[in-house]
């Protein structure tokens, strides 16, 4: 139901733009990568590809019932997204913004594997909220490394993980504070959101770990055998991929570079929940800028739907489905 909220908000905005005479496309995609997808597929005994195919069919059926007017609803597990993710990664690498680092990472000795974000739970290192995953806190929206979790427990085995070294790739976000500030000053952002972003910018802006170790469901990083793009590297690129897919369907593929080049007059707006604000307003704009691609003109952020006083969350089983709600 939380996802339907932002789809409905966007739908209202898009319909207004169309009524006003503006040429407006409504583009979206299913986030199809990451540890939760892999775990769920393993649990029910099907491949991740089959799982995301089934989920997308259900989502499209639900959107039809709510009369959501997407021009294209794609998936991040697509040839277009793989192509664009590799393109952006290579551009960032060419700009000297990708760096290898040896990091300490949680390792499950029972399962003999490194534990990526959703394989581990513990207390948030910022606000002490219980039952938080290893990448970001659903309570305070902080992002962090899984090793920083307090009292970590492996989701897979229930054991206490040990610490081992692994080589990871980092996007040098710490060097790009001025670029983020410049984008923020020239974008349409709600004042409370702007204040939160300025708070983050005044703090310790850290380089961003964009790689994950095998096993992981996602795109392999070019040139690395057992490394995958972290889901939040390729997920927002899915907007561009959905547009490229739309253009291909309409035999307009050559328009992509004209629309998405850094000097394009096209306007781009996002509607998101506040839990993913960090990724959309700090990482994504400078990923695009340093790839010579158009940055968003604005980001509209909504708060959480709650159930029994807690954030509605599908991954935690605390939610009302959009299908049940409409029935």
Model-assigned labels for residue ranges:
Residues 1-28, 75, 80-84, 127, ...:
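Structured secondary-structure scaffolds
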Residues 1-181:
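N-terminal, positively charged nucleic-acid-binding surface of large information/translation enzymes
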């Amino acid at each position: 139901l939380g996802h339907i909220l932002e789809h409905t908000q966007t739908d209202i905005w898009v319909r207004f733009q169309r009524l006003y005479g503006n040429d407006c496309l409504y583009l979206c995609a299913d986030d199809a990568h990451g540890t939760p997808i892999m775990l769920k597929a393993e649990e029910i005994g099907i491949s991740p590809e089959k799982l995301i195919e089934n989920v997308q069919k259900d989502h499209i059926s639900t959107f039809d019932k709510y009369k959501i007017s997407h021009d294209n609803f794609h998936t991040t597990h697509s040839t277009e997204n793989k192509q664009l993710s590799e393109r952006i990664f290579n551009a960032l690498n060419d700009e000297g913004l990708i760096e290898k680092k040896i990091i300490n990472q949680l390792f499950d000795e029972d399962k003999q594997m490194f534990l990526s974000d959703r394989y581990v739970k513990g207390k948030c290192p910022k606000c002490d909220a219980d039952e938080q995953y290893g990448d970001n806190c659903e309570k305070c929206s902080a992002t962090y490394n899984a090793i920083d979790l307090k009292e970590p427990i492996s989701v897979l085995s229930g054991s206490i993980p040990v610490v081992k070294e692994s080589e990871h790739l980092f996007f040098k976000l710490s060097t790009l504070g001025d670029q983020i500030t410049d984008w923020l000053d020239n974008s349409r952002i709600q004042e409370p959101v702007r204040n939160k972003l300025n708070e983050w910018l005044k703090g310790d802006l850290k380089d961003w770990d964009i790689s994950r170790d095998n096993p992981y469901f996602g795109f392999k990083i070019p040139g690395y055998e057992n490394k995958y793009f972290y889901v939040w590297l390729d997920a927002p690129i899915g907007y561009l991929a959905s547009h490229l897919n739309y253009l291909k369907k309409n035999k307009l593929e050559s328009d992509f570079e004209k629309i998405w080049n850094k000097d394009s007059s096209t306007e781009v707006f996002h509607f998101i929940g506040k839990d993913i604000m960090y990724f959309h307003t700090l990482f994504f704009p400078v990923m695009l800028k340093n790839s010579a691609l158009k940055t968003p003109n604005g980001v509209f952020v909504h708060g959480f739907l709650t159930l029994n006083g807690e954030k509605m969350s599908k991954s935690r089983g605390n939610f009302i489905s959009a299908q049940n709600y409409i029935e």
